[in-house]
Amino acid sequence: AQYYADLRDPRFAVSFAVYHRRFSTNTLPRWPLAQPMRLLGHNGEINTLLGNLNWAKASEAGLEDVWGEAAADLIPVVNPDFSDSANLDATLELMVRSGRSITDSLITLVPEAFRNQPDLDSRPDVTAMYEFNAGIQEPWDGPALLVFADGKRVGATLDRNGLRPARWCTTADGFVIMGSETGVVDLSGKTVVEKGRLGPGQMVAVDLERG
């Protein structure tokens, strides 16, 4: 924080913050690939990346239906020279800028395991939503813990493999903290009212506009 003058200014205040630090495991470190990206911070790998890139490339022709002539400025949406995280971020941003909420977009891109899922037997509407989304978007499968923010919502979601740690808590004075481990934020003097961990396919999100 000492490097950035705005962060040292006592007048500087925000309603949320996303912080990510991780060694690159499958690409060479480069500033354009530094995280968090425009909408995402990603801990993990996308093991379906090749199929996802091919699907995205094949779908580019449909961009004109939403964006008209401006679609030419968006192509290519994905780039095989970029990291898996950067390509997922670009795909998510396209969906969000096209009018879908960031939470709905992530549920589509990174769905939970909904087939033969006993917990969803009483929620046919949820199963129907996932089945509909599966027809228009192939899943980006991890292992992946994704932290997201678009200025309207901030949160985190775990892919259906559930192989990345994600712990959260809320405090009596209104803070919501989520991290890959406890202790990321000093909670000395604060009263924790609820805490837990994300399971496979689960999401925690805060609506910054409505509270």
Segments from the language model and where they lie:
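Conserved short alpha-helical segments that host acidic/polar catalytic motifs at enzyme active sites
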Residues: 1-211
